[in-house]
Amino acid sequence: MKIALPTLIAAVAVAGVAFTTPADTMEGHTSVSPQDIKWGPAPAMLPPGAEAAVLFGDPSKEGLFVLRLRFPAGYSVAPHGHPVDEVVTVISGTFSVGVGETADPRKAQHLPAGSFHVLRPGMAHYVFMEEETVIQISTNGPWGLTYINPKDDPRQKSQ
């Protein structure tokens, strides 16, 4: 029995499409394409102007979550700490981070796109961006941030 080559190619192509499942619909897996990211205002614990997008999990609940933050040029967060490890990947721009209870831009490390940084629990640090910057944070919730100086906390200013 002879099968024409065009018929065989068409059958293989149809079979390949029939058994291909996009990663974002596969049970137990999560995929987010850049065009599907939904940006909104960042949590109130951050100064106004930043935007956030939750890629995985829920920052308000216990468990792993992944969050993207987009900061405008000139944005900064006063010295603060977190209750658990934060794993930061710089997606675009330059993320400047310094360690200590007093912000000193001269002592900051400037991390370009593609950089990786881990912030340990309770470690006082400050961040600033001279250009628009996007970072990705992977950590465990509930997400917490405690300012070294409570007067720096934007949540206090809104009350």
Regions found by a protein language model. Give the residues of each.
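Conserved short histidine dyad/triad with adjacent acidic residue
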Residues: 62-82, 110-112, 120-121
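Bacterial N-terminal signal peptides that target proteins for export
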Residues: 1-9
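A short, N-terminal "cap"/entry segment at the start of jelly-roll beta-barrel domains
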Residues: 21-65, 152-159
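Double-stranded beta-helix
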Residues: 28-32, 106-109, 126-159
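Short acidic-glycine-tyrosine-enriched beta hairpin
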Residues: 95, 101-122
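Short beta-strand His + acidic residue motifs that chelate non-heme Fe in jelly-roll/DSBH
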Residues: 77-79, 97-98, 119, 124-130
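C-terminal segment of classical bacterial N-terminal signal peptides
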Residues: 14-21
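Glycine- and acidic-residue-biased ligand/ion/polar-headgroup-sensing regions
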Residues: 72-75, 81-102
